[in-house]
């Protein structure tokens, strides 16, 4: 069923913390794209329809997030709060719902929001976009069948903005110049080079820069100090490999130890390996509380030298584009686990020509099969 497919793919899309990140962060891809794909596969819709639905879902989700940013409770995880409406908007576009049906879909989705940031670093965090995608599909299907909800759920008393943000929603951001520009282009998004929280990207790249510049290995380093902002966890060692995706210490240790940070860097086996335990003991994090400053990595070497390097705008961030070779390395890190070279190449060619795919099931039939 498309609701189950959207749920599963929403989880898969977020569990590695590898998807692109908008501004402010809200995980629009793992909330909206699975909704659109699930319905389009069943209905045999085109790639162009997927693109339109994805852009629209991203737009609605991003506008709501930006409009309530100053009032958002940090205990709520953004894809759980905004994703169901983004998923509903994307689903409504795929199904071709009319104005009234779309209002109903958004009203239904608004009653299905939720997700707590206390679950960061655990498996349940990834269910927030999964639930968003599933609820988006379900809301649109229910609305199409005549299910009703408030037609003013965003602004009405005891509605979405009132309940979740104490009414503090900037409506100019929500509806101003709607359709004149699109948030997926402006302000755009970051592409993560590494499968970890976005706040880990600068620390990882700073350590890799340092390691490569001076030809370092973990054995050469007595202590590694990272001066960074207050974003991301630190101070306690990750309980699992998955938890390491949100730990400055672990991400830095992984970069120093292996000279790369990939999907396999975050297994439990890797987390509790003797080499990782030894390297983690060398990492020290100093917080400066400033988000805008670059991350500075300084290594005190066993031979007495002290060397430093930094990263302030990681590769893949807006303004520092990721080249094709690095993007493809990221793709193959993901696909090589399930697709052989031939299937993977076919998938890439189809995705790069998405707007000309007549039936999206052509693509889905490839990526849903294990060929290795």
What is the predicted role of each segment?
Residues 7-31, 45, 49-60:
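Active-site metal-coordination/substrate-binding segment of hydrolases
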Residues 1-25, 121-134, 141-372:
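Terminal-appendage/accessory-domain detector
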Residues 28-49, 83-97, 197-215, 256, ...:
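Alpha-helical support elements that line or immediately flank enzyme active sites
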Residues 40-139, 150-157:
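Glycine-rich, mobile lid/loop segments that gate access to catalytic sites or pores
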Residues 37, 65, 89, 172, ...:
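Short glycine-/small-residue-rich flexible loop motifs, especially phosphate/cofactor-binding loops
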């Amino acid at each position: 069923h498309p609701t189950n497919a959207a749920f599963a793919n929403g989880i898969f899309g977020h569990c590695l913390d590898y998807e692109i990140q908008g501004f402010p962060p809200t995980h629009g891809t793992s909330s909206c794209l699975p909704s659109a794909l699930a319905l389009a596969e069943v209905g045999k819709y085109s790639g162009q329809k997927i693109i339109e639905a994805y852009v629209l879902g991203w737009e609605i989700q991003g506008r709501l997030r930006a409009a309530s940013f100053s009032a958002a409770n940090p205990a709520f995880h953004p894809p759980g709060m905004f994703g169901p409406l983004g998923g509903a908007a994307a689903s409504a576009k795929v199904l071709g719902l009319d104005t009234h049906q779309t209002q109903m879909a958004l009203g239904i989705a608004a009653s299905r929001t939720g997700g707590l940031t206390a679950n960061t670093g655990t498996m349940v965090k990834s269910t927030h976009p999964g639930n968003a995608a599933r609820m988006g599909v379900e809301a649109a299907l229910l609305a199409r069948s005549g299910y009703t909800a408030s037609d003013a759920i965003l602004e009405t008393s005891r509605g979405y903005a009132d309940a979740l943000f104490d009414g503090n929603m900037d409506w100019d951001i929500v509806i101003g110049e709607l359709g004149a520009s699109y948030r997926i282009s402006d302000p755009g998004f970051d592409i993560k080079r590494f499968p970890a929280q976005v706040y880990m990207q600068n620390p990882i790249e700073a350590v890799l820069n340092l390691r490569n510049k001076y030809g370092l290995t973990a054995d050469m380093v007595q202590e590694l100090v990272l001066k960074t902002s207050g974003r991301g966890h630190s101070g306690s060692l990750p309980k699992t490999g998955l938890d390491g995706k949100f730990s400055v210490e672990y991400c830095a240790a992984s970069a120093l130890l292996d000279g790369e940070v990939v999907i396999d860097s975050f297994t439990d086996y890797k987390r509790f390996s003797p080499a990782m335990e030894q390297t983690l003991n060398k990492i020290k994090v100093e917080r400066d509380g400033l988000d805008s400053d670059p991350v500075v990595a300084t290594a005190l070497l066993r031979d007495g030298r002290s060397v430093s390097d930094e990263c302030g705008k990681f590769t893949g961030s807006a303004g520092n584009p990721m080249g094709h070779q690095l993007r493809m390395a990221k793709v193959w890190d993901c696909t090589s686990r399930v697709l052989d070279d031939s299937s993977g190449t076919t998938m890439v060619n189809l995705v790069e020509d998405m707007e000309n795919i007549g039936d999206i099931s052509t693509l889905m039939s490839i990526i849903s099969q294990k060929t290795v």
